[in-house]
Amino acid sequence: EVQQGQTPGRVMVACRTYPAEGMVVNTESEKSHATRRECLEFLLKNHPLDCPICDKAGECDLQDYTYQEGQSTGRSKEGRRHAEKRHSLGDVIVLDQERCVLCSRCVRFFEEVPKKAQLTVSNLGSRSVISTFADRPLTGNYQGNIADLCPVGALTLKKFRFQARVWNLVKQASTCPECSRGCSIQVEVLRGGEVKRFRPRENKAVNGWWMCDTGRFAFDHVNAPNRLANALVRSGHALAEASIEDGLAAVRALLDAHADALFVASPFC
C-alpha cells in the first residue's frame, strides 16, 4: 500500500512503481494482505494440488506465499483447467503446463541471457501455455537454468525428476570442477552420500546467477561405484593407497627432483 502526500493509500504493483520523495510504503497493511490473498486465489484457481508429488515442494514460491498469507479456500465453483502434464522440451527439461503460472521468467531468460529466444506464450486467455516455436526441442547449454528460475514445479530437470525430496538434501557450497572458469555452485547430496544435483550459487564476478548444463550434470563420476576414494602412490610396480597428504608429498618430491617447471597441464584448463 503506497501513500504519498494527502492522497489515500493505494495498492500498487511493486515492480512497476518508482520511488518518489515523501512516499510511504506499507507492505503489511490489511489492504496489502487482502490484495495478495486475492492474487493467490486467482493463481490457485487452476493450479493443481500436486504438492505431495511435486519436485518443487519445499522450495516452491507459490507454496511459501500460500502458507504466509493463510489462503486455504477458494470461491470458484468451476472445474480446474487441464493441460498437458508431461510435455518434453528436449533432452533436459519437462514442462507441466497445468502447474505453470505464466510468469514468463523462462521466456525472458532465453531472450536476455543466452540471447536466443526459444520459448513463447502461445494461445490466448485461459488457454495460454508456454511452448517452443513450432514445438521444436530446446537447444543450447543453459537450459537447466529455467528449472531454477521457475517459481513453481512447471519446469523440472529430467535428471532430477522424482529423485529426491529437497528437505532430504544436504547442501554445500563448492566450485564447479568442469572447466577453468570455476563457477560457484551448490552441491546437494542425498542423506547417505549420493550427489543428486549441482545448482548455481550467486557470484557476480564469475558466473552471475547461472551455470552451463555441462557443469550442472557433471556429477555422475562422483557417484560411480568404481571411483577412486583414496590417493594412490606407486611403490615399485604396484599402486598402494595413501592419504591425501602423502599423495601430495609424493607429487612434490617428483617435481623437486626435476628442473623448474615451465607449466602445469590440467584437463580442466
Residue ranges and their predicted role:
Residues P48, D96, C103, R108, ...:
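Catalytic alpha/large subunits of respiratory electron-transfer oxidoreductases
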Residues V2-P177, R181-I185, E194:
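Fe-S ferredoxin-like electron-transfer domains
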